[in-house]
Regions:
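Acidic/histidine-rich catalytic cores of soluble enzymes
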Residues: 115-210
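Generic structural signal for well-ordered alpha-helices
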Residues: 20-24, 43-50, 68-73, 105-112, ...
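Active-site acidic/histidine proton-transfer and metal-coordination neighborhood
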Residues: 59, 67-152, 159, 245
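Acidic-and-aromatic substrate-binding clefts and catalytic sites of carbohydrate-active enzymes
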Residues: 12-18, 34-48, 64-71, 92-95, ...
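N-terminal pre-domain/capping segments
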Residues: 1-78, 147-149, 252-260
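A structural motif corresponding to the C-terminal end of an alpha-helix
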Residues: 30, 110-121, 145, 219-230, ...
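Hydrophobic faces of well-ordered beta-strands that scaffold small-molecule active sites
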Residues: 3-9, 35-37, 58-64, 83-85, ...
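C-terminal/domain-terminus segments
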Residues: 231-258
Length: 260
């Protein structure tokens, strides 16, 4: 089984992202099949964007829109079987009470219904500060919202002191999208706390080959193949420290070296 690999534009300089053709050139030149990070607010805008991507043999992944119905329709038109619901955020970064969980889950339910109507899997980002942040959050939220799918983000799970492989082993058939990235911290032998104000002074997301917190990238990808995962794997690196063309090329080359 072949995994489909996309480049995510999170962290790319605005002057590059605003030049869509330049984005396509970089992504295609680095060897990716798709690109994630674009949005559209009308069918006409989507047509222009999709036509440009097609010139480079690229697929548009998880296209965003402010409107839930528009997002569902745009993605199903592209043949995407999954798209992202709007993130629900924890209050003050703490785990919600049962009542607060119900309050946060409420706005997600109509989004789940809208996406499901069109055969689009509604996924929520596993992300620091959001409703889904840790392995324990996944267990609790999926029980409360059984129609929700996971955006499996390896970097955010690591930053939250959760093991991405635990999530993959427990919910292999509930993953609808993947953000693959690594995590680096100044002293990996000491337990880090992403909720401390100075956390990002000593920790960061990093190149796939650069992490020092135990992520086995090949094991993650092998696990997705074993689970017969049919979605996209987007390579993401928030706040890259080098030129994005070099970073995304190096990350793609790293995947090739481990068989992907």
């Amino acid at each position: 089984m072949k995994l489909r690999i996309a480049a995510h534009l999170c962290g790319w300089p605005q002057e590059i992202v605003s030049d869509r053709r330049r984005v396509m050139e970089i992504v295609k030149g680095a060897g990716y099949e798709g690109v994630e990070g674009f949005g559209a607010e009308s069918p006409e805008e989507l047509v222009e964007l999709a036509a440009l991507a097609a010139e480079y043999g690229l697929h548009l992944v998880n296209v965003g829109s402010r409107d839930t119905l528009m997002k569902a329709r745009l993605n199903v038109t592209l043949g995407n079987n999954a798209a992202e619901v709007h993130n629900a955020r924890k209050k003050d970064g703490r785990d919600p009470t049962d009542a607060e969980l119900d309050e946060l889950a409420g706005p997600l339910e109509p989004q789940i219904a809208t996406f499901s109507k069109y055969g689009v899997r509604p996924f929520h980002h596993i992300h620091l500060g959001c409703l889904l942040e840790t392995t324990e959050d996944c267990q609790r939220v999926l029980k409360r919202l059984p129609g929700l799918w996971l955006l499996f983000d390896t970097g955010h799970l690591l930053a939250a002191n959760s093991n991405p492989l635990d999530v993959l082993r427990r919910w292999p058939k509930q993953i609808a999208h993947v953000h693959l990235k690594n995590f680096w911290t100044q002293d990996p032998k000491v337990r880090w706390d992403a909720h401390k104000p100075d956390f990002w002074k000593t920790s960061r997301f990093c190149d796939l080959a650069e992490g020092n917190t135990g992520l086995d990238v090949k094991a993650v990808l092998d696990g997705l193949v074993k689970a017969e995962y049919d979605g996209w794997v987007s390579i993401e690196e928030d706040h890259p420290r080098r030129d994005v063309a070099d970073v995304w090329r190096d990350n793609r080359d790293f995947l090739r070296r481990i068989g992907y």
